[in-house]
């Protein structure tokens, strides 16, 4: 019953003006910065013949 009343009332057009400010999206967590290089850098290459994974088998 009340929906019929709302349909009869014309909806006023939005008044052009300042746009509604959109809030900034939540920033994604930044990755950890690279640690300072040690004297012997850790090798991440899997091309080495003797890797820990092969030795563990």
Swiss-Prot record:
According to the record, what induces this protein's expression? Expressed during stationary phase (at protein level).
Start and end residues of each stretch annotated as Disordered? 7-57
Q: Extract the Pfam families matched here.
A: YnaL
Which InterPro entries does the annotation name? YnaL-like (IPR056956)
Q: Compositional bias (Pro residues) spans?
A: 11-35
Residue ranges with Basic residues bias: 46-57
Task: Tell me where on the tree of life, at the top rank, the source sits.
Answer: Bacteria
User: What name does the UniProt record give this protein?
Assistant: Protein YnaL
Organism source for this protein?
Answer: Escherichia coli (strain K12)
Gene that produces this protein: ynaL
């Amino acid at each position: 019953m009340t929906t019929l009343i709302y349909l009869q009332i014309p909806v006023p057009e939005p008044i052009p003006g300042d746009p509604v400010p959109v809030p900034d999206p939540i920033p994604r967590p930044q990755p950890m910065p690279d640690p300072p290089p040690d004297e012997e850098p850790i090798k991440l290459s899997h091309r080495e013949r003797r890797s820990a994974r092969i030795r563990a088998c």
